[in-house]
Amino acid sequence: MEFDRGLLQALTEKTAAEICKWAYDFPYNIYNFINQPNEYLLNRETWGTEQFCLIQDEKTVGYVSCQIEDDCLWIGWSMHPKLCGKGDGHLFVLKCTEEIKKRFNYEGSLYIRVAASNQRAVKAYQKAGFVYQKQIQDEVAYSNHIENF
C-alpha cells in the first residue's frame, strides 16, 4: 500500500477508540490495546501535540506518538493490523517521519525504540533508512542518522 495520500491528524475520540480495538496476530499481539487500558493513548491533552493518527482515504491507517527528550525527537507508531506483514512498513515509516518533520518544522535526527524481538518492525525501520544505535534493556534504538548516541 502506498501512503502518499496519508495525512497526519490529531487523535480524536473516534480514532483513539478505533485504535484501542486493533488486534495483532501472534507474536505481535503484545501490542494490542484490547482489554489493556492505555492512559497515555486516552490522554486528550496530548492529542495533536504528541499523539496523532495517519488518515488515508478516510480510514485510520496508523497511530503516531512523538516526544522531545533532551533535544531528541523520539517517535513511536503502530500500523493498522490489516496492513501489517505485506512489506509496506517502510513506506508507512517514511510517510510518518515526513509528516512529523513538517508538523514540527524539525530537521534534526529522529529516534525510535523497538523491541529487539520485533524483527518485522526492525526490517521496516532499516529499509526506511534508520540505523542501529544501541541496545536499551530489551529494546534497540535506531536513528535516521549515523551518530554517537
Where are each of the predicted segments found?
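Conserved acetyl-CoA-binding loop-helix of GNAT-fold acetyltransferases
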Residues: 85-100, 123-127
